[in-house]
Amino acid sequence: MLLIIITEPGFFDGEAGLINLLFEHGLQRLHLRKPDSNEADFESLIKQINPQFYNRVAIHDHHHLAVRYNLFGIHLNRRNSLAPDGFCGSVSRSLHTIEELSADKQKYDYVTLSPIFDSVSKVGYNSQFTPSVLNDLRDRNLIDSHVIALGGITAYNIATLPQYGFGGAMVLGALWNLKGDREMFLEYFERLRKKI
């Protein structure tokens, strides 16, 4: 299974250093998501990421920068729903309902489905997918290797995802909540990697 880390929505001091550290310790893919960012700040963060890792970075905002920096991919969402002209990389998309999953899954290289569990980073953003619903979606081939689980993913529940057929997991709050303690941050990342 693929482990994807998605950034916090806001910038913070030392963020690029932690991103590079994750890549140095085997991070397969990073989704850079800064919904309220201006282009200059967003691009500045990209420039602070070691260019050898650009082939593992997908961006949710300012998609034309994916072309400029030859990044791995872009992630479409309600704010940014079209790929930029000339972009030939990976295209993924956020999905939140069974109807969206059924209609749109095949249009993209991969999709995220959320929230699978109650969100760690968004208070009150609770899962709409019970274990029986997830089993049904797997049995109907709606969840497969192209569907990435998002929402409430922690080191405690990540190991349950393969039974539902997910191709990977995207983690946000459970990891970034530890950003103030580099050792605990890296230890938690390693726990996620080992359990996936």
Where is each model-derived feature located?
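Active-site pocket-lining/capping segments in soluble small-molecule metabolic enzymes
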Residues: M1, T7-G10, L76, S114, ...
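Active-site mouth loops of central-metabolism enzymes
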Residues: M1-A16, S92-L95, I148-A149
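Short secondary-structure boundary segments
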Residues: P9, K34, R78, L95-T97, ...
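Alpha/beta enzyme core
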Residues: A16-Q28, R79, L101-L113, T160-Q163
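N-terminal active-site wall of soluble small-molecule enzyme domains
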Residues: F23, L27-F87
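Alpha-helix-loop-beta-strand connector modules within alpha/beta enzyme cores
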Residues: E43-I59, G86-I98, S127-A149, A155, ...
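Catalytic cores of alpha/beta
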Residues: V57-F72, L76, H96-Y108, L137-I143, ...
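Glycine-rich phosphate-binding active-site loops on the catalytic face of alpha/beta enzymes
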Residues: I74-D85, T112-Y125, I158-L192
